[in-house]
């Protein structure tokens, strides 16, 4: 109860200013003005990349038909234009692209697909680790072990991103949630692209068909989750995995990737509990092998992909924590990227150093990551010329940094900081 009362006191003392409120405008004109004033740079090529994936997916998807796809495209365009919905859909655009591309995989003609690798993963497993770890862990089964594997793999795995999004919104610095959304989306998008270019059979295929060559006519299998269906008298996992758009997507393991990325973000916000978060990663890795869905080498690939995406986001965009602050409403300014230490950042804020560009800003200190110096050009220009948590200025401001920190934020800033993302 003491922790809860302390949290309530902190929340009551917070300056919950207008910059943390939802944008409620339905007028699309501010979005068009933002686009018109955007300082375009090579970093905006990411949207060309996303558009290319969406166009490819729309070409190959057979259901829904043309008008269905046209209607969805129009709704998405409206959602990205109207400020009320833009603050949600803009940070999620990468996740939406990944989901549509993942769904489109079931419609890709077989003549466009590369051959399926059946022997590569078990061979690598034996070469690197001296044995097939997945086979060893799945030999002994028991209903209790099935439940222990099902809870994180079949339940927590799918709910964790939403729970973590809520936690990051409340307890992380403003701007962390959109960084999490984009990092999560890009990790999954790259993972699916690798699975499309390098299709590999999972352990359940070896158990069912041996090392015989595979074809795309083979349907997916729930593996060990079939025992969960039998235990509860359902067919949820059997039906779900049998109709999966990506049957031969063993490498990299996005189950391991999700768990690792979740652990990295939570460890960033709650470093004291990082061992618990990484313990969950190990637990889920055991589940994937016990349920015959992945080889250990798949898990390594998925975790490496998550680490690469997180490090990139951390260096360039992830807001820094500040000592003594727990809730997002306690932050008066935010520094993006980790080119500077927390001590140096706090010192810059106290002294009003010109290297600190306002309430929420990048630092142009020479010791920062070199690439960070041009990140202001990546962001959409704020036509009101106001600073807010999650925004950048379209032109250098003459006032000192200390004055900028004390200025009230723009009332048009979203709680998701969506309109100012690169």
Curated annotation (Swiss-Prot):
Record protein name field: Inositol phosphorylceramide synthase catalytic subunit aur1
Description of how activity is regulated: Inhibited by aureobasidin A (AbA).
CDD domains reported for this sequence: PAP2_Aur1_like
Keyword DNA-binding on entry: no
UniProt keyword annotations, A-Z: Glycoprotein, Golgi apparatus, Lipid metabolism, Membrane, Phosphoprotein, Sphingolipid metabolism, Transferase, Transmembrane, Transmembrane helix
Subcellular location as annotated: Golgi apparatus, Golgi stack membrane
Primary location group: Golgi
EC number: 2.-.-.-
Family note: Belongs to the AUR1 family.
Tagged with keyword Transmembrane helix: yes
Disordered: annotated segments: 386-406
Segments passing through the bilayer: 48-68, 69-85, 88-108, 160-180, 184-204, 246-266, 275-292, 293-313
Annotated GO biological process: mannosyl diphosphorylinositol ceramide metabolic process; sphingolipid biosynthetic process
Glycosylated residues in this chain: 132
Membrane topology: Multi-pass membrane protein
Lumenal compartment segments: 109-159, 205-245
């Amino acid at each position: 109860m003491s922790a809860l009362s302390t949290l309530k006191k902190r929340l009551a003392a917070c300056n919950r200013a207008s910059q943390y409120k939802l944008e409620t405008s339905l007028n699309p004109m501010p979005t068009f003005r933002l686009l018109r004033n955007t300082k375009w740079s090579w970093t905006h090529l990411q949207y060309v990349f996303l558009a290319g994936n969406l166009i490819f997916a729309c070409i190959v998807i057979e259901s829904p038909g043309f008008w269905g796809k046209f209607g969805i495209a129009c709704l998405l365009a409206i959602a990205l234009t109207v400020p009320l919905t833009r603050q949600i859909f803009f940070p999620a655009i990468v996740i939406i692209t990944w989901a549509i591309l993942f769904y489109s995989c079931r419609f890709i003609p077989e003549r466009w697909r590369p051959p399926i690798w059946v022997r590569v993963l078990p061979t690598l497993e034996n070469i690197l680790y001296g044995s097939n770890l997945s086979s060893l862990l799945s030999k002994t089964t028991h209903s209790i072990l099935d439940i222990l594997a099902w809870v994180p793999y079949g339940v927590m795995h799918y709910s964790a991103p939403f729970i973590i999004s809520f936690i990051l919104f409340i307890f992380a610095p403003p701007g962390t949630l959109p960084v999490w959304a984009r990092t999560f989306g890009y990790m999954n998008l790259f993972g699916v692209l690798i699975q499309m270019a390098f299709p590999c059979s999972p352990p359940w295929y070896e158990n069912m068909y041996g090392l015989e060559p595979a074809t795309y006519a083979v349907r997916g299998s729930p593996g060990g989750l079939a025992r969960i269906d039998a235990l509860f008298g359902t067919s949820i996992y059997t039906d779900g995995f049998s109709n999966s758009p990506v049957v031969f997507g063993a490498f990299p393991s996005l189950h391991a990737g999700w768990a690792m990325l979740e652990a990295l973000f939570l460890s960033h916000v709650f470093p004291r509990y990082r061992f618990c978060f990484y313990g969950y990663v190990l637990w889920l890795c055991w589940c994937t092998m016990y349920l015959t869905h992945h080889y250990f080498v798949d898990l390594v690939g998925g975790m490496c992909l998550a680490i690469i995406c997180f490090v990139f986001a951390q260096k360039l965009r992830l807001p820094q924590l500040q000592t003594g602050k727990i809730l997002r409403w306690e932050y008066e300014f935010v520094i993006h990227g980790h080119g500077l230490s927390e001590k140096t950042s706090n010192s810059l804020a106290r002294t009003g150093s010109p290297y600190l560009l306002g309430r929420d800003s990048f630092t142009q200190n020479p010791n920062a990551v070199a690439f960070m110096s041009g990140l202001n050009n990546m962001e959409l220009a704020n036509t009101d010329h106001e600073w807010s948590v999650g925004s950048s200025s379209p032109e250098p401001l003459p006032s000192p940094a200390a004055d900028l920190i004390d200025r009230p934020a723009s009332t048009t800033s979203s709680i998701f900081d969506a309109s100012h993302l690169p």
